[in-house]
């Protein structure tokens, strides 16, 4: 009789802990599904969402390049222009900038301009050398933040051949080359 009671007690405790484990396991499954869903959205869906043509004209911003000459956003007309806003202290920028630079070298028909925001020339120059960045423009006063609605780094703004902002991608995207390919093929016509 005593053994039967102990067996029932053990069975009840085991059942309770199994339910807790399954509930906790289900919670982790749900969390994993949400993370995977966000990653799919960030990498494959969001970069394919473009604003309607002619909605937002690009601001007539002018920045100095690292080597002294002026860069005018309006000079990008006739080509798809990617403005890559970053800061040297931004860890995700350090991961994404080399991907963007590699894509830029492979696609000379597009214009890619990395823009260092909020930092002086010497800091920007050191960072550009370290990461082998080309055509770097400077925005030491941070005017890009209100002009292009840059809220965080990295941020890439895509401007079509007619000078209209068609997309803005914020945050690290490991598949940024895929997003840039899609934008170039959509807007170079």
Region spans (language model):
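N-terminal targeting signals for export/organelle localization
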Residues: 1-62, 178-181
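A short beta-strand-turn-helix
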Residues: 60-81
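Active-site acidic short loop of glycosyltransferases
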Residues: 77-79, 109, 133, 150
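Short pre-active-site segment immediately N-terminal to redox-active cysteine/selenocysteine motifs
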Residues: 79-81, 85-89, 152
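Hydrophobic beta-strand anchors of alpha/beta hydrolase catalytic cores
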Residues: 82-83, 112, 156
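Structural microenvironment flanking redox-active thiols in thiol-disulfide oxidoreductases
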Residues: 94-131, 140-146
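Thiol/disulfide oxidoreductase modules built on the thioredoxin-like
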Residues: 128-133, 139-187
């Amino acid at each position: 009789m005593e053994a039967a009671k102990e067996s029932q007690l053990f069975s009840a405790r085991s059942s309770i802990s199994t339910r807790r484990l399954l509930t906790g396991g289900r919670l982790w499954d749900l969390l994993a599904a949400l993370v995977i869903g966000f990653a799919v959205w960030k990498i494959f869906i969001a970069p394919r969402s473009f604003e309607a043509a002619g909605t937002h004209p690009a601001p007539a911003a002018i920045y100095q390049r690292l080597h002294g000459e002026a860069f005018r956003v309006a000079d990008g007309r006739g080509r798809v222009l990617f403005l890559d806003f970053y800061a040297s202290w931004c860890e995700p920028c350090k991961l994404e900038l080399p991907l963007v630079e590699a894509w830029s070298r492979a696609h000379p028909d597009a214009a890619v301009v990395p823009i260092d925001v909020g930092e002086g020339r010497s800091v920007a120059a050191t960072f550009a050398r370290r990461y082998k960045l080309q055509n770097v423009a400077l925005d030491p006063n941070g005017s890009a933040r209100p002009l292009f609605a840059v809220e965080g780094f990295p941020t890439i703004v895509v401007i079509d051949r007619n000078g209209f902002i068609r997309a803005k991608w914020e945050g690290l995207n490991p598949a940024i080359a895929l997003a840039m390919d899609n934008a170039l093929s959509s807007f170079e016509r």
